[in-house]
Every structure is written in C-alpha cells, then in structure tokens.
Amino acid sequence: MTIRDLYVYSNDEQIFIIFEDGATKSCFKGPLEYCPTELIDRVVYQFRAIDFNTIEVVLL
C-alpha cells in the first residue's frame, strides 16, 4: 500500500501524520491532498488511527 492508496480512501477531514521508519519527527502533517509529490508513491509500513480524523503513518 502506498500513500496514494490511502489518499484514494481518505476523506477531506482526515489529517495524516507521516513519519519515516525510525524517525521521531514527522515529515508531513495535514490532509493528503497537500502531501508532497516525493511522498505520494512511498510504501506504507504501518498506519493507525489516533482518533476519528487523525491517522499516523510510518513509511518503509
């Protein structure tokens, strides 16, 4: 699964916090509509819902 796949199934109200694997500082935070193009095709290692509209994503 890639960030693009998450974008297809997300809604406009969801906020994504994206981390590189092993990093403690996020590389992106916001709606996937504004995700940088260099991240959109990256493979997702895992993701989890922090609450109804906030999703934490870890990239490979």
Outline where the language-model segments fall.
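N-terminal acidic leader/helix
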Residues: 1-24
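Detector for the mature cores of small, proteolytically processed
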Residues: 20-60
